[in-house]
């Protein structure tokens, strides 16, 4: 295996795709799991568990958190993933409103449950706008 093939395996065929044997697209994984593919369910559970571990680790390192922000493909578009990541996070002050989570509205949507100590937000990603802003900044230097 040459270096390009190795990078392809590490970057494209490992992680959730490697565990599931299906895909790295969470929509495909959720559909496969609904159809009985236990490996797809395991891959999703492992991913969500990893996100929880990172939240807990960073909360410990920072002495707590003020907000959790979900963005990008999975964070922005997958209510099930957000719910699973936030499940059992009450100890940290994270609780989400089920209805708001399942139907986020606007580019910035607060899905925090009433009484939660940590705000939980879903923020739309606009990568093209960020690239344009960064390009403008570089060109103006």
Named regions from a protein language model:
Residues 22, 32-33, 90-93:
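Short, surface-exposed linear patches
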Residues 1-12:
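A conserved active-site cap/scaffold subdomain adjacent to cofactor or substrate pockets
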Residues 8, 15-19, 26-61:
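Adenine-nucleotide phosphate-binding core of ATP-dependent small-molecule kinases
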């Amino acid at each position: 295996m040459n270096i390009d093939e190795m990078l392809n395996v590490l970057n494209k065929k490992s992680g959730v795709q490697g565990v599931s044997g299906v895909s790295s697209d969470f929509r495909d994984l959720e559909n496969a799991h609904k159809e009985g593919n236990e490996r797809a369910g395991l891959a999703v559970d492992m991913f969500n568990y990893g996100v929880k571990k990172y939240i807990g680790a960073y909360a410990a390192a920072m002495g707590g958190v003020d907000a959790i922000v979900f963005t990008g493909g999975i964070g922005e578009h997958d209510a099930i993933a957000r719910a699973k990541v936030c499940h059992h996070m009450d100890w940290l002050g994270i609780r989400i409103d089920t209805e708001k989570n399942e139907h986020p509205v606007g580019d910035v949507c607060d899905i925090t449950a009433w009484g939660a100590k940590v705000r939980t937000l879903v923020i739309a990603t606009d990568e093209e706008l960020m690239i344009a802003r960064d390009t403008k900044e570089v060109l103006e230097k």
